[in-house]
């Protein structure tokens, strides 16, 4: 995740625990780093999109098991919006068993525009991720095969240090794979188009 997203989570947790002291927050994390999975599986790509399942969904289900509810029925409110992508424009406001049988996805802001989102946030004085104020159009992972050039440029300028290990890993894979123009491969997102089981 982007550093300001993690910071925002902490701020929101602190804010709501001050208001509701009995409110419990649980954090689901994978037992290994995302880069260790890159070593095993290769970079995620627009064809091999393993990252969300491995780094987000699986840890949530593991957390349910740890907390004693192996077959928890889950209602997830997510913030996806139709204007974000062609795929998302085909989503319904309610998705039953879309990725997992026991999960219902509710998408209350699916048909909202970006302007409507920010007007709502400002009107209700809600926390806003700093990355939006820095110019990002979508806030998600620090590096993503579905990321756009604009967000990548901002991430490289604002989050050079946390981004560096990922770009170094992409360069290493490119070198191992015999890519001639590594700078171009990394800069133009060649790693995002990986379609085979190979690392590049």
Task: List the predicted regions and their residue ranges.
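ATP-dependent adenylation/nucleotidyltransferase module used to activate substrates
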Residues: 1-123
């Amino acid at each position: 995740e982007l550093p300001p997203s993690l910071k925002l989570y902490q701020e929101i947790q602190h804010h709501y625990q001050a208001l509701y002291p009995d409110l419990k927050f649980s954090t689901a994390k994978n037992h290994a780093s995302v880069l260790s999975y890159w070593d095993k599986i290769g970079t995620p790509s627009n064809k091999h999109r393993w990252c969300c399942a491995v780094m987000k969904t699986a840890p949530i289900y593991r957390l349910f098991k740890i907390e004693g509810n192996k077959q928890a029925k889950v209602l997830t409110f997510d913030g996806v919006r139709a204007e974000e992508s062609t795929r998302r424009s085909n989503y319904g406001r309610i998705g039953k068993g879309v990725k997992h049988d026991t999960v219902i996805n509710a998408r209350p802001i699916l048909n909202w525009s970006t302007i409507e989102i920010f007007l709502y946030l400002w009107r209700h004085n809600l926390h806003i991720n700093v990355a939006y104020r820095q110019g990002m159009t979508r806030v998600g992972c620090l590096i993503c095969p579905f990321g756009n050039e604009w967000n990548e440029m901002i991430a490289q300028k604002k989050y050079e240090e946390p981004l560096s290990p990922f770009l170094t890993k992409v360069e290493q894979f490119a070198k191992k794979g015999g890519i001639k123009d590594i700078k171009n491969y990394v800069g133009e997102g060649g790693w995002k188009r990986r379609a085979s089981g190979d690392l590049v």
